[in-house]
Amino acid sequence: MNDLQWPLLGLFSVLIILALFGNLLVCAAILWDRSLRKQPENLFLVSLAVSDLLVSVLVMLFAAVNDILGYWPFGQFYCQFWISFDITTCTASILNLCAISLDRYWHISRPMVYIRYCNRRRINYVIVLVWLISAGIGAAPLGFGFGSKVTINNLTGLPVCEMRLPLPYAIGSSMVSFFLPAMVMVILYTKLYLYARKHVRSIKTQLQQATSFLIMQLASEKIREVTAATLKGEALLPPDSPATERTTMTVSRHYSRRSTTTTTTATPRRGDKKTSSQNKVESIRTSIFSKLNFLCPTRFKNQRSPQDPHTPAAHNRSNISDQKARLTLGVIMGTFLVCWLPFFTVNILRAWLPEIFSSKTIMAVTWLGYANSSANPLIYSIFNRDFRRAFKKIIVRVFGCCWEEPDLNKSISSRYAAPDNIERRRSCTRSSESAHDNNNDANATRLNLLSNNNEETIPE
């Protein structure tokens, strides 16, 4: 082996191991974990993992041997089947990715229709259709007697398994196997991203309108209170009066697609003491925010009271979901297009002009496509919290070890936490530390008392 073959051996080994064990782990997680098994949409992930697993076992292993040795040692018979397995399994992997994008689009954009019509039986029909189309495209070279042939290299005298596809088949199979599914995925994921942005902006607008409406209602209620007191000749206490006033406030928010209804009821009860104006405003803000926190917990989970939506902290928090959507869709589509677009472009041009590309170029774009089977378990499974939890259980059961799962959402949210939340967490920490110290002092006091009592009971 020369100096170039050793790095290739290491690279091919890493890709094969990732594809093999990653997809095995996905299948095991869905089969063993009850919560994952109950979700019908995970059947698409099982089908994707099976197709990528077959790519690693039936295609990548033999391609690695062929490219490292520089010749084909497995004979004419398996050369034909190897090319057919390559086309079938890679097409199934791409079509499964397209089916996953369709499933996610219907699940998010039309959830009621999805819940009503999408079940295990229909998902199984789609998976069977995916594999039938893939098998039909992959079996065509065997049925019509084209696609591969073992020839003898004139320079080395060693056998070489060559792929020879007619131009009509190369164009047709590339359209069905990649270009049409890629077009569908780009359109659907773009629409999903735009839908998510529109949904987030709609929620932000509704929250701003509801907050403004509540403030107007409270102001008008206070005006009516002052007017009634003036007409009755009652005295109005100044805002900084030490008297107390209890205010019971109920806020009900009902969202619909076209309207937002807010009902506010303020019942003041005057007593001998009244609270200051600042405490009243703070109690009202806290009550309002508690309702908003219930209605939109992901946005207001770490805040104590509603803030101005135009402040930098609120703006950063509102952009977290948008950044996550861009990152997720960018990783999904970026990895898919980078891996497969060069291969299918070269595939069509190679059928048209066979001598235009070198063997190294063909090997590079081929393994770039195979790398997608190694990346799919990482993209579609490990970034999912339920799958990470299932992977942890499997690894603990098999190897007897464990890891501390990082909370990505918590780390991102902590970056944009409001200063009052940080101070509150610090105060809670100081309180817990002081409580711990007090408990230690109390325990030490008890021990001293016990020791003193014991010393008194010992006879001299």
Curated annotation (Swiss-Prot):
Tissue specificity: Expressed in PLM and PHC mechanosensory neurons. Low intensity expression found in ALM mechanosensory neurons. Probable expression in AUA, RIB and RIM interneurons. Expressed in the RIS interneuron.
SUPFAM superfamilies linked to this entry: Family A G protein-coupled receptor-like
MF-aspect GO terms: dopamine neurotransmitter receptor activity, coupled via Gs; epinephrine binding; G protein-coupled serotonin receptor activity; neurotransmitter receptor activity; norepinephrine binding
Entry keyword annotation includes Glycoprotein: yes
Source species, domain of life: Eukaryota
TM helices/strands, residue ranges: 11-31, 43-63, 68-88, 126-146, 169-189, 329-349, 362-382
Membrane topology annotation: Multi-pass membrane protein
Cytoplasmic side: 32-42, 89-125, 190-328, 383-460
Biased amino acid composition, Polar residues: 440-460
Pfam family, one: 7tm_1
Sequence ranges on the Extracellular membrane side: 1-10, 64-67, 147-168, 350-361
CDD domains found in the cross-reference section: 7tmA_Ap5-HTB1-like (cd15065)
Keyword field contains Disulfide bond: yes
Sorted UniProt keywords: Cell membrane, Disulfide bond, G-protein coupled receptor, Glycoprotein, Membrane, Receptor, Transducer, Transmembrane, Transmembrane helix
Cellular compartments annotated: Cell membrane
Positions annotated as glycosylated: 154
Main function: G-protein coupled receptor which binds to the neurotransmitter dopamine with high affinity. Promotes the secretion of FMRFamide-like neuropeptide flp-11 in the RIS neurons which inhibits late-stage swimming frequency. Plays a role in modulating mechanosensory behavior in response to non-localized mechanical stimulation. Under mitochondrial stress, plays a role in bacterial preference, resulting in learned avoidance behavior.
Protein name: Dopamine receptor 1
Origin species: Caenorhabditis elegans
Gene that encodes it: dop-1
